[in-house]
Amino acid sequence: MTKQELEQIARITLEEKEGKLYRGYLDLRGTQITSLPDNLTVGGSLDLRGTQITSLPDNLTVGGSLYLRGTQITSLPDNLTVGGSLYLRGTQITSLPDNLTVGGSL
């Protein structure tokens, strides 16, 4: 997914810096989004509840909480970093990667 496609779906403007995307709270809840850009960094929380997304990119960094309820995600990517809480209720995720970092509750 390109930066422009993500902006169109989320109806926001993203600041691009060194190939990563930075922004505060990124609310994609209930959208038709199916993928996220590689190496995405979200400064605040990332809300993907009820989306069509099936996987997360490697090296995803979320400064706040990550909400995945109602998604089709079955596993978490390598090097996932979540500064806040990670909400997995209502997903098909059955195991966690060894290198997962979560600053809040799980």
Question: Where is each model-derived feature located?
Answer:
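Extreme N-terminal leader/activation tails
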Residues: 1-13
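A detector of tandem-repeat and repeat-rich interaction/domain scaffolds
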Residues: 11-106
